Amino acid sequence: MNIHMKRKTIKNINTFENRMLMLDGMPAVRVKTELLESEQGSPNVHNYPDMEAVPLLLNNVKGEPPEDSLSVDHFQTQTEPVDLSINKARTSPTAVSSSPVSMTASASSPSSTSTSSSSSSRLASSPTVITSVSSASSSSTVLTPGPLVASASGVGGQQFLHIIHPVPPSSPMNLQSNKLSHVHRIPVVVQSVPVVYTAVRSPGNVNNTIVVPLLEDGRGHGKAQMDPRGLSPRQSKSDSDDDDLPNVTLDSVNETGSTALSIARAVQEVHPSPVSRVRGNRMNNQKFPCSISPFSIESTRRQRRSESPDSRKRRIHRCDFEGCNKVYTKSSHLKAHRRTHTGEKPYKCTWEGCTWKFARSDELTRHYRKHTGVKPFKCADCDRSFSRSDHLALHRRRHMLV
């Protein structure tokens, strides 16, 4: 009878050990043995003296520690393979982190939630975007502002996450850095690529393409000013009307302008611009002056201001007659002065019966007021008026002396 009871006790112990091995990962607890219903009625089972050794045998069985205690180490990252599919329903949220270099996503398993949370807190300082995607629903929900995460697709057994960045409607010059400006900054090396513009005139003509290279940096290049008319009307006015500019003669202006135009044309012949090249092929190789050349009107003005003292002497117009050393700043004044030496009087009075002639036009105007009686110069202190400005100046001096 005692041998039979010992066998049953050993059998129960083996059964509990098998249960402990099946429950892998569960903590070891002290379990009180329960007898079968057929053995509960026998009084010899409770009186067996060796039954107290059963808890001692269970204490000798060492169970594996739980995984929660193993994941306490916050300095270890997850190295196990992770299933990236988002179609499966999970109870725990999946953390997806996308880096700008490799675009790989890592998710935490339900057993190591604390490890993934600690690793995500350490990686928060790096320039990455961490978005939480709830995989229990069919559509992915992005909790933080960032790129949209589409459904995963597998190629060759590998899972990939499609990260879609919202692209604002902008010009082609807005590069990839403009798209990701609200998410994170990525250092992008941009190379200048020439832009090709195609102009189609008519079905009979061949497409003319103009290649305009993009400037990498505006420091080393001059400002390109598009002016289809060539010279501005202000410059042409200064070239034609020399009396409005003091200390500038018509000869010096024409000489400076012709020099600038000749230099610009020489530069265009050596390095023709794409626009002039297309125009030359279209209009029988006739090259038009274009203001894209580095010699613009502003450069000629700067060159004119910073001239040498020798060029300033050219602006002083001297009378070349013997014994006359008069100097004028305008060429018209010098021409009028030279008429006094030559005796030429081209300006004649047109009043009937008057035969007066004058060397200057202003003298003729003053003389003509004698015939008409016009006195445009009026005194502000009294009611008198005069036909000449110098007479009014003498009259006002008298008022000041009184």
Curated annotation (Swiss-Prot):
GO terms for biological process: negative regulation of transcription by RNA polymerase II; positive regulation of transcription by RNA polymerase II; regulation of transcription by RNA polymerase II. A zinc finger (C2H2-type) spans 317-341, 347-371, 377-399. It holds the Pfam family zf-C2H2. Coiled coil: none annotated. Residues 282-298 have a biased composition (Polar residues). The modification N6-methylated lysine is found at residue 313. It comes from the Eukaryota. One of its GO terms (cellular component) is chromatin. Residues 79-125, 217-254, 268-314 are annotated as: Disordered. Its main location: nucleus. Keywords: DNA-binding, Metal-binding, Methylation, Nucleus, Phosphoprotein, Repeat, Repressor, Transcription, Transcription regulation, Zinc, Zinc-finger. Residues 91-125 have a biased composition (Low complexity). InterPro entries: Znf_C2H2_sf, Znf_C2H2_type. The keyword Cell membrane does not apply. It is found in: Nucleus. The keyword RNA-binding does not apply. Gene3D superfamilies: Classic Zinc Finger (3.30.160.60). A motif (9aaTAD) lies at residues 80-88. One of its GO terms (molecular function) is sequence-specific double-stranded DNA binding. The modification Phosphoserine is found at residue 202. Signal peptide: none annotated. Residues 217-226, 299-311 have a biased composition (Basic and acidic residues). The 9aaTAD motif is a transactivation domain present in a large number of yeast and animal transcription factors. In KLF12, the motif is inactive. Belongs to the Sp1 C2H2-type zinc-finger protein family. Confers strong transcriptional repression to the AP-2-alpha gene. Binds to a regulatory element (A32) in the AP-2-alpha gene promoter. This is Krueppel-like factor 12. It comes from Homo sapiens (Human). The lineage of its organism: Eukaryota, Metazoa, Chordata, Craniata, Vertebrata.
